[in-house]
Every structure is written in C-alpha cells, then in structure tokens.
C-alpha cells in the first residue's frame, strides 16, 4: 500500500539515511522509513495537517544527519530517531527545493508565484524559523 494514492503527485524520491539506519521513501503525502536489508516498513510520517495536506516534494540530509522533508508548502525536520524536530509551515505555495546547508542555515528555493516565481528562503536549521526571504 506504499503507493496507492500517488495520483496527482509525480514526486517520488528515496534516500539512504545512514544516521537513522533506514531508507526514506517519499511520495504522495508521506515518507515511509524502510529497513535497508529487507525493505520492511519500520514507520511512516504523514505530511500536512488534519484539515488538509501538504504533498511530498523532495528529501535532503543536513550536516548533522537531520532529514529534511520538503513538501509543496512545508518543511519538516526529522531527527535520526525518526521523531519530528520541527515543522516550518507556509514556506511556499507550490514547491520547495533544497540548495544547501550553510552552517546553521538551510538555503532553499520556494515557489511563491507559479509558474516559475521562485524566491530564495533561509531557515534556521535548529528551529525552522525563517531567517530571510
């Protein structure tokens, strides 16, 4: 049932996450954490809120081993324990891409005026707070 509701979201990525000892697979409205040796599902993270949802976009691993889940609107920081550290809501309206981590800052691009209205965004890696837009 991993990909049963993928219709409408073309994004699907998998990344080996050594700090957590898992493979993270993002698609639809979730990230599934899999055992590398067996492919067994260990846990999953659902994107969005109870009254609506964000959709999966991309995955990135920060300098300290944190997994960053980039949705269409939100950014979620996940610790190697697979617990959510923070959620930055409303970062974009139609997509977020990873540029790099520079020290304590996450450098992202956020689409704010589709199509093509990409703007740079800087988040604090420890808190998810907007540093600069």
Regions found by a protein language model. Give the residues of each.
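Repeated scaffold domains used in trafficking and secretory/extracellular systems
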Residues: 2-20, 47-64, 91-103
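Short, surface-exposed charged micro-motifs
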Residues: 23, 67, 98, 120-122
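Histidine-/acidic-rich catalytic cores in large beta-rich domains
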Residues: 8-11, 105-108, 131-133
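Surface-exposed loop/turn elements that mediate protein-protein interactions on large endomembrane-trafficking
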Residues: 1-5, 31-51, 73-92, 118-133
């Amino acid at each position: 049932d991993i990909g049963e509701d993928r219709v409408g979201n073309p994004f699907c990525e998998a990344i080996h996450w050594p700090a957590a000892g898992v493979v993270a697979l993002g698609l639809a409205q979730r990230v599934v954490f899999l055992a590398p040796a067996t492919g067994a599902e260990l846990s999953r993270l659902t994107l969005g809120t109870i009254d609506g949802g964000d959709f999966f976009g991309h995955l990135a691993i920060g300098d300290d081993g944190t997994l960053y889940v980039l949705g269409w609107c939100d950014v979620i920081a996940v610790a190697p324990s697979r617990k959510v550290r923070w959620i930055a809501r409303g970062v974009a309206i139609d997509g977020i891409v990873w540029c790099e981590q520079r020290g304590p800052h996450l450098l992202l691009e956020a689409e704010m005026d589709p199509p093509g209205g990409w703007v740079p965004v800087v988040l604090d890696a420890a808190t998810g707070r907007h540093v600069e837009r």
